[in-house]
Amino acid sequence: MTKPTEEELKQTLTDLQYAVTQENATERPFSGEYDDFYQDGIYVDIVSGEPLFSSLDKYDAGCGWPSFTKPIEKRGVKEKADFSHGMHRVEVRSQEADSHLGHVFTDGPLQEGGLRYCINAAALRFVPVADLEKEGYGEYLSLFK
């Protein structure tokens, strides 16, 4: 995958998608289209299309952002120390496009490993199960059998 140029990204992404993925912005809580959204499918990086999260691992954390217990594949995301805003957090970025996705916290469901991947909806695109094969994500159909 070759990451699109800054100019290409500005032409294809909304202002919010660009600010979140390229400038590490955070969308307002409870404003993203996937916060209260529970259809079966996968969530991919809005920039590169790389698979990130499954709806099977999504839950309502009540925080205002889509929350997941884990990524589809651990190697699909990278974590980075974030000391911005006077806090110490762990930032989550996509592996290939290096898009800012959100942060991971240790206050998730204990029975699922205790992690909460708090992700900006603006960094994601949802691919429903019915479209996985057609859009090139057929290998993930087995998650939903």
UniProtKB/Swiss-Prot annotation:
Residues 6-129 form the MsrB domain. The active site is at C118 (nucleophile). It catalyses: L-methionyl-[protein] + [thioredoxin]-disulfide + H2O = L-methionyl-(R)-S-oxide-[protein] + [thioredoxin]-dithiol. Keywords: Oxidoreductase, Stress response. One of its GO terms (molecular function) is peptide-methionine (R)-S-oxide reductase activity. The keyword Lyase does not apply. GO terms for cellular component: cytoplasm. Its EC number is 1.8.4.12. It comes from the Bacteria. Belongs to the MsrB Met sulfoxide reductase family. This is Peptide methionine sulfoxide reductase MsrB. The gene is msrB.
